[in-house]
């Protein structure tokens, strides 16, 4: 297992298994993981040992609630696209093509991870609506079905338009994180 990855996403396991229950084993001695930038900002200046699991939980819920639609009122599939990992050459080309704009990135093995949300936003999709589907106005990584009337074809059509526009502007092909069934 890794962040947003597991054997269940591999080709030989996809559509073969259904997860119906999960057991977690939590370490009672590990410290808080504050690697997410929003958490770093919230707990800036605090001694890590003084931060409780409840505080971290509440901070994560507040952060997500500020960006994501309420699933009880606005259906979505959550994060729709994976953050792409690109080569140093591709990253440098994006930086050169966007002077004066800070390109968010995370150095990873094999290159740079670029937030898909940033790429989508740079293509002008944030808040865009078409038919019964839309790109969430606070988080362009999320495709929503606000009226609960969207067909699978409408979602896939918007998905494909986003993929094409990001590829045309940046030379990066986004990969859906959602599982089409």
Predicted region positions:
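Phosphate/pyrophosphate- and phosphate-bearing ligand-binding catalytic cores of soluble enzymes
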Residues: 1-153, 169, 173-181
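Phosphate/pyrophosphate-binding loops and the adjoining catalytic core of nucleotide-dependent enzymes
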Residues: 162
């Amino acid at each position: 297992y890794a962040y947003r990855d597991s054997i269940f996403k591999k080709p030989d396991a996809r559509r073969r298994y259904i997860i119906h229950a999960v057991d977690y084993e939590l370490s009672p001695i590990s410290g808080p993981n504050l690697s997410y930038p929003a958490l770093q900002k919230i707990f800036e200046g605090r001694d890590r040992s003084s931060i409780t699991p409840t505080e971290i939980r509440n901070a994560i819920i507040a952060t997500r609630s500020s960006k994501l639609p309420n699933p009880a009122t606005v259906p979505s599939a959550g994060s729709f696209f994976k953050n792409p990992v690109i080569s140093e050459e591709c990253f440098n080309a994006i930086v050169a093509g966007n002077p004066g704009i800070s390109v968010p990135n995370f150095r990873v093995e094999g290159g740079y991870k670029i937030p898909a949300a940033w790429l989508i936003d740079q293509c002008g999709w944030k808040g865009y609506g078409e038919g019964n589907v839309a790109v969430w106005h606070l988080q362009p990584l999320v495709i929503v079905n606000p009226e609960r009337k969207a067909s699978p074809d409408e979602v896939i059509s918007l998905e494909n338009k986003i993929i094409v526009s990001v590829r045309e502007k940046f030379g990066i092909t986004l990969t859906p994180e959602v599982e089409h069934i």
